[in-house]
C-alpha cells in the first residue's frame, strides 16, 4: 500500500494531514487510509452554469477508510463529530468507519470496494495491530454475475416503488407518495453502488447515499445540485424526510407541486441509473 502524498499539491497534503489528526482524536483508529480520487491523483474541482441557469459544483471528496477494532459509539455519531470539526474545508469529507472483521469479511468474499482501497489507497496512519486479509480476486464472469444480480434486485424494487408513489400521488396521499419516492431513490443509489463497487452503506440517509455514489457518476450527483441552489436543497431535504418525517411527524408538509417535481426528477434518475449500470455490467466479464 502507498504511503506518500507527494503526487498532491502541498495545500492538499496539509489539509489531509489535518483531517487525519482530527479522525485520530475522535475515533482512536487502527488504520486510516485515504482512497478515491485524491489517492489516485484524479481529483476534480468543477463549477459551471447550466442551461437552466442553475450553478453546478462538483468537487471531489476527501475519502477516508477508518479501521477500528471495536466501536462503542455508532458510526454515524463519529461521522457527525468529525464532519462538525472539518466544516471549514471546501472539500467535502467522506468517511467509511468499519471494524477490521467486517472489512476482512468483505475482502475474503471478493468485495472490490475494499479490495480497491487496499490496492490503490494511501496509508495515512497505522498502529500495526491489525492486518487486512488477502483479498479474493473474482473472475470477470463472477464479477459480472454478481453485479447483474444486484442490479436485478434493486432496480426492480425502484420500479415497483415508483408505481406505488405515482398511485399514492393520484389519490392525493402525498405523505405516502413521498415515502415511496424515498424508497425509489434509496433503491437506485443502492443499485448503483452495488453494481460499481459491490458495497452498500448501512444508511437510509439520502444525503449520505448521494455522497457515497458521488465518484461513480457526476451526472447522477448533479441531478440535485444541492450545494449551489437553496431550492434544490429544500427539495432534496423533503425527499430525504420521506423515510421518517412523512410517516411519523405531524408537521411534515409537502405541496402537490413539490411532489410532482420530485416524481419527475426521480423518474429521470431511474432512467440514468439504468443506463450507467447496464453500461457498467456490459463492460464486465
Name each model feature, range by range.
Residues 2-26, 45-108:
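Metal-dependent nucleotidyltransferase catalytic core
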Residues 25, 31, 72-80, 94-285:
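Terminal alpha-helical segments
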Residues 30-51:
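Short gly/ser-rich loop at a beta-strand->alpha-helix junction or flexible surface loop bordering the NTP-binding
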